[in-house]
Amino acid sequence: MAFNDDNFMLKNEAAKRLYQQIKDQPIFDYHCHLDPKEIFEDKVYDNIVDLWLGGDHYKWRLMRANGISEEEITGSASKLDKFKAFARTLQRSYGNPVYHWSVMELKNVFGVCELLTEDNAEEIYHRINAYLVEHQISPRKLIADSLVRFIGTTDHPLDDLAWHKRLAADDTFETVVAPTFRPDEAFIEHQCFADFVARLAQATGRTITDFKSFIAAMEERIAYFAENGCKASDISFTEIVFEAAEPEQLDHLMTRVLEGYQPQPLEIKQWQTAVFAELCRVYKHYGFVTQVHFGALRNNHSAIFNKLGADVGVDSLGDQAALAINMNRLLDHLVQRDSLPKMIWYNLNPSYNITVANTLANFQANENGIAGYLQFGAGWWFADTKLGMISQMNALAEQGLLANFVGMLTDSRSFLSYQRHDYFRRILSTYLGEWIEEGEVPEDYQALGSMAKDIAYNNAIQYFS
């Protein structure tokens, strides 16, 4: 069987027919971690390592598993040596999604059809570097060549959004680059919480002395983001919690934390519940899609974290007790307060997929006729795999309406990661094609093709409008 050809990952004839209907659709990448400054400056790359390996903790994680020294991963080894070290790892990474992503990127972006190995790494390294310069490969070219129509970046609440403003004013660049409000530091367990409150007060010109004034200042920043094209918020929680607290408790807690007090687990849960509920109220007012990533246990290798910082490949999927109870209580609390915005929930631990999909189905009712008001998001991070995608789609199809799914996102720091949209579309086509082949749905390529098109692109446009 041929590998990585036009029918890559398409397991049956039905899949091939469905894929033909969606393969050339544009991309609506509603959540990523790209830097808008890099998009605006649009510098031409001259080395594949900067573009392909820099900041890619997926690849770093595999390289460590293959015994590669840190010197050749994040250290001061030459770029050629780092490329060779990754090639040595890639040829042993069968079964890992990084293998599929990498061979797709090499072929579809750089025209490298042969498999990268330690033996041919140096020749391919120099060939790609020449290609980068000859074809003037830059962020905007990669975006345009991938037919990306929308990019949702991830941004600090105090960001002045200067680069987003410059991009919006640039008539030569057609892709919309919108900010996303990501207030991680608004939660008291964050080591930068006190500094964040001080900077928030300075940015808004407000005196922040209690919970109410804190939320008012946050609302001002949300309004600023809305004025500058923001369509969504995002947050990452280790666990989904629900613990009610009185305003006086929150005021007292905030005062103590700002004085250096280390909050206890119950207090962290109370603050998370209260702040998130208030933010959701404001998000709904401004029409933001509220994205919730949960279940990551971060920075587990303390030595590597202390040396390199966060997002370097030492994170895990977590677990938690009473997810169903907490998630249902939280969503019901938002409904009772008329504060339930459109939401996308990304679950990191696939063992909770049915729980999440089932819970979201309880709260789909809305007065605006929005299909899929609460979304079960695509497989995230460690679940961004073939089996992870299928598990998520299985749970959504069985517990809700897969046809209303807003589909794929890169959630990536790499301008090469748009190949993941094609990877998802191939897996989606096979998934739906198997339904046809096994007689589980009518052999109606117009209906199934329309469903595939909606999931691949159309639903996201409508949902974020």
Swiss-Prot record:
Family: Belongs to the metallo-dependent hydrolases superfamily. Uronate isomerase family.
Record bears the keyword Isomerase: yes
Protein name: Uronate isomerase
Catalytic activity as recorded in UniProt: D-glucuronate = D-fructuronate; aldehydo-D-galacturonate = keto-D-tagaturonate
Domain of life: Bacteria
GO biological process: D-galacturonate catabolic process; D-glucuronate catabolic process
Gene Ontology MF: a single term: glucuronate isomerase activity
Keywords per UniProt: Isomerase
Lineage: Bacteria, Bacillati, Bacillota, Bacilli, Lactobacillales
Enzyme Commission number: 5.3.1.12
Entry-linked Pfam families: UxaC
Pathway(s) served: Carbohydrate metabolism; pentose and glucuronate interconversion
